Amino acid sequence: MDMAILAAQEEGGPNTTLSDLTGYEEYDFNAPRTEFDIGGLQGVEKAEESKILLLKEAGFNMNLAPVIDLATSSDQIMYSRSISGEVETVSSYAEYAAKFDQPRGVSLVLQHFPGYGTIPDSANTGVGAVVDDREADAIRNTDYAPFKSGVTAGAHCVMMSNVVVQKIDPTHTAALSPALHKELRDTVGFSGVIMTDVLDDADYSAYADGKKPAVQAVLAGNDLILARDYATAYNDILTAVNDGTITEAQLKEACTRVLAYKYTAK
């Protein structure tokens, strides 16, 4: 029987799907940064174990975490959700999570490639795309490192960000960018499932080459689409398949990766 993907978002801190519900845990899980400040990596790892056991017990087989963006300052948008701004620390966290979570039947999703980096907290991702204007090599030499560690450790999935990486692809958000997907495949070396972040939490149509964002997401190389209005996203993709915008070969490639993931994750 085909395995259904049942995902939750249990990062700890501001994003807790289960631990903030009465009857699951006595208290919400702390954010990884809080755990790190209290007990270092050992504290983070202990909290990770508790999260995964909770998800597994509740019947989930995917966690939309960990956040492995590098955030060095409290005025950066991912500061409260990330563990640290230190490359080595975040890389170790990504590696540990992959090695611990997945053998216990819960796939992780490394997020948000290529990273929100220095984007300030004042940037509101609910009103449109935000721009990272750092040099491409600066991003590759720092922000890619945690993703490489998680991928090398066997991470099944990676989530793309809704950031415009100005020096790599100024016309698309990462989730809609063929160039950023190529970076993830070729430079990071990831061959697993790529998914979008939520595609309709803002209007990203200006970055979709005149297409519907869900359609451009498939064309860019995503295998799974996250959308609150999933019916609209589905119908947009179906229309694009029927009119030839999305080819059968592209669909088969994405489906093959998803099916391979399901087989591996069983």
Where are the model-predicted features located?
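Glycine-rich, aromatic-flanked loop segments that form ligand/cofactor-binding clefts
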Residues: 1-25, 47-69, 90-115
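Active-site-proximal loop/short-helix segments
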Residues: 13-14, 20-21, 61-85, 111-129, ...
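A charged helix-plus-loop insertion that forms the helical arch/lid used to bind
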Residues: 21-38, 84
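A short acidic, glycine-rich active-site loop
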Residues: 32-44, 133-139
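Active-site cleft segment of glycoside hydrolase catalytic domains centered on the general acid/base Glu
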Residues: 37-44, 74-90
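Aromatic- and glycine-enriched pocket-lining scaffold segments that form the walls
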Residues: 55-58, 76-79, 235
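Second-shell residues forming the walls of enzyme active-site clefts
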Residues: 89-250, 257
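Extended, intrinsically disordered, low-complexity segments
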Residues: 254-259, 263-264
